[in-house]
Amino acid sequence: MEQDNKEQAMHQPPMDNKMLVPVSNVPVSSGNSGFHQPPATQYLPEMMRSYMASAEELRCNEREWESQLIRSLPEHGVRCPSQLAPIPFQNYCQRSIGRGSHVMPVGSSGTLGVTISFSENLMPQGGLPSSRGVSVMAHSSAPAMPYPMPPTVPATTGSLKHGILLVPGMASAGTHAVAPFMDQMLHSINPCNPEMLPARFQQLLPLDSQDSLVTESNTQEEPFVREPPTPAPEGAESPSTSRGATRRQSPVSRPYVCTYNSCGKSYTKRSHLVSHQRKHTGVKPFACDWNGCTWKFFRSDELGRHKRIHTRYRPHKCDECDREFMRSDHLRQHKRTHLPK
């Protein structure tokens, strides 16, 4: 019996860092507030092979979704979106892949199981790193929220020696994982050029946004051209012309018409017609009786103005310079000289 036990111990692989122990039994480093994950979600993975078999079945069923997720991950180290499964007291671990590192949640909504054996630090959200060499088998049933932004966990040093990560098998979890990458790709593309978008991303845009983008591009291509004013019809008249025609065609009674040699002029008063006909006949009945003056006039008002020359009578006087004038029109013309220039 003792020899069989020795041979079994020789063939058994070392379990220094790969030993599967509960998280609650791991000693906490100095200054750490403790690992406060509920004990109900921490299990000792003694049936690792059964979970690995279930993981292989899930990978076969969800191979298409996994390939899409792996292609979306960058080749060099970039932080994966930590909003895959927001759990209030969720633990994050730093996983080293190639030359980079990213942060992955240990437990998430819709995840059937996660089995990881590694020698690195565990970081609870808001706490200090725990000790190394821990194997965790976590099942979580916390509801997932759409794209929350928990605080980013600082990167810690360490290298992953051995680990198995089960990809979520539910379609809703896959949708939550792919949506952030789609949002980043949509934001990285210029929204003003809908032609640059791939066909699958153009289907994601709402119809009203596509219409607004097409309208904006059309308005940018076509320059603004001012339309010429519409010409008025030929028969139409301007308002000023129509008012003038109405004034000329006003129904004013002019019964007195001159018949001398088809003159055609008409007047409102008979006296005006008589004085007009004197111009045709040349008769000047109003003669000046001043001594030695032989002037004659057609009208009496003209004779009265003429006599002012002889008498020196000037009835129109300027208020500013006291100058006197025989006629009112002469006074108006004189007042223009006093206006400021």
UniProtKB/Swiss-Prot annotation:
| Stretch list, region Disordered | 214-252
Give GO terms for biological process.
gamete generation; negative regulation of transcription by RNA polymerase II; regulation of transcription by RNA polymerase II
Which InterPro entries did the record assign? Znf_C2H2_sf, Znf_C2H2_type
Listed Polar residues bias regions = 238-252
Q: What is its main location?
A: nucleus
Zinc finger C2H2-type: from-to = 256-280, 286-310, 316-338
Q: Does the keyword Nucleus apply?
A: yes
Recorded GO CC terms: nucleus
For this chain, one GO molecular function annotation is: DNA-binding transcription factor activity
Q: Which UniProt keywords apply?
A: Activator, DNA-binding, Metal-binding, Nucleus, Repeat, Repressor, Transcription, Transcription regulation, Zinc, Zinc-finger
> Where in the body, by tissue, does this protein show up?
Exclusively expressed in testis and ovary. Localized to step 3-8 spermatids in testis and growing oocytes in ovary.
Q: Provide the protein's localization.
A: Nucleus
The record's family statement is: Belongs to the Sp1 C2H2-type zinc-finger protein family.
The protein's matches in PANTHER family, at most eight in alphabetical order, are given as: KRUEPPEL-LIKE FACTOR 17 (PTHR23235:SF159), KRUEPPEL-LIKE TRANSCRIPTION FACTOR (PTHR23235)
Its biological purpose is as follows: Transcription repressor that binds to the promoter of target genes and prevents their expression. Acts as a negative regulator of epithelial-mesenchymal transition and metastasis in breast cancer. Specifically binds the 5'-CACCC-3' sequence in the promoter of ID1, a key metastasis regulator in breast cancer, and repress its expression. May be a germ cell-specific transcription factor that plays important roles in spermatid differentiation and oocyte development.
Q: What protein name applies here?
A: Krueppel-like factor 17
Per the UniProt entry, what species is this protein from, by scientific name? Mus musculus (Mouse)
Gene (name only):
Klf17
